[in-house]
């Protein structure tokens, strides 16, 4: 069987399943993987101990006998405003929190895993000989962005994310490790897409917490996404004010990227902002009702009243589960402290009462965050 034809067939099948792009690369140790060791030694990983897994240094260590990696890309962008453009009216009276674009809809792990498994089924129909295949979506010991680069899907930008000339960076990556010997998407003599960041420094300069040590190097301990999702304890006080209204993740270094200004929106309903229960005491103007009732800039007064039971119910099947109740409510407290809300605002009384209750709760991290917020708005 023609190996080159097999690789073309795989890409076609992946697109038929719903992926935007697909590439194949041999499982080998790429130069960027070696750089990870130094990055970890500098402590930039923070509490993300899973990044120390030695299998991440070489795809061949992730699965016995692996020869090839199939990398699939799925666009999650929507036509909603970017974080820097989303400025709802009355923010000083009715403050909202920002949830990262990728987390508005269904859990991407589930969305991509279903498609990857469907592709594995097609592979077994195409290749009758016995072979192993494992699908991972941000869960295996694989550095997807590096592998994707060598599969021809993009270049690693100064913000450390994979960038694609047509799609920007609003996309997810999923991989299939397999013992099949497949022809790489890049032919002999071909190199990965060139770095098109040029002299641009917008992502580096826009980061409010100055998480970028230098171009292509990020100190995750200062990254708002890390602080709001991965960090389990209290957020360092010097980083709280720069966090602004972020309650889960951050899109700033992507939103300022010129390549994302032309990024197309995904047609998938799975990535549209998830609808939420009505949570206002009074109905708002029709023009903003959709915003209030979805994960697109939800109201802080609602987030601050979430019980642990509410959290489990509302965020079942959502990426926000990762932050857990403590993390999300802690983040909402910080956002409330940064909101600039003052007495007389539409939701001031409700937010004040919620923060006072949280300041007395049994969870020390949440209580301290609420106390900090109270000191800022009273």
Language-model features: locations:
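Surface-exposed helix-capping loop/turn segments at secondary-structure junctions
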Residues: 21, 125-132, 213-214, 342-349
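Alpha-helical scaffold domains
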Residues: 235-378
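Iron-sulfur cluster-binding cysteine motifs and their immediate structural context
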Residues: 16-19, 202-225, 246-270, 354
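Short, contiguous, pocket-lining structural segments
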Residues: 168, 192-199, 215, 239-249
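A short, charged helix-loop
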Residues: 179-182, 186, 218-231
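Conserved helix-loop functional segments at active or binding sites
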Residues: 182, 209, 213, 229-232, ...
